[in-house]
């Protein structure tokens, strides 16, 4: 069976996936340059993600989509199971969003240019001044129902288990006064774990949890950040039937 997967990946997934990526990148770039950034910064990615899920023989289901309002902007925080998380979230989240990305992605042909034109939010790692720049960029993009997706673990899991969350996404949410929505992803680790190049078909699930209220001035930034981080980690860990980190 593994030999079949290798053959299928080489002759079907790789060539068709490359074509899909180029088309999605071009559609995003041209659409955004023509003034349709809000729509074309998102919808080509949705089609791209759905096509990849079907191409890789990995169906998915979404639980809890009714908990979010399409007209509200959120910070979605999800566990990071693998590279396939990107396809799954585009395909199934059902809410316009942008990514928080490292600037190194700008160097990728077609994809980097498309991400820039789509208004993806680039992480500025120059300390406090960099955070302010990131906040300003986010303020320009995250409005009218456009949200952001962040992986607070910071990197893909090597074991399939949840890692401890970092504060960055929650600090940004507190500064922007935006609600946070924990999202549990299951299945992408089995499809394409970190360090593997072999895609293995597997069922996937997105579980959208109840939104956590935005940090208020009365609550204070430090206390609010800790609340959002702790509650998000707890909700996702319990959904995965894993111990809650203290």
Predicted stretch roles:
Residues 62, 121-124, 214:
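Short acidic-hydrophobic, aromatic-tinged amphipathic segments that line or gate anion-handling sites
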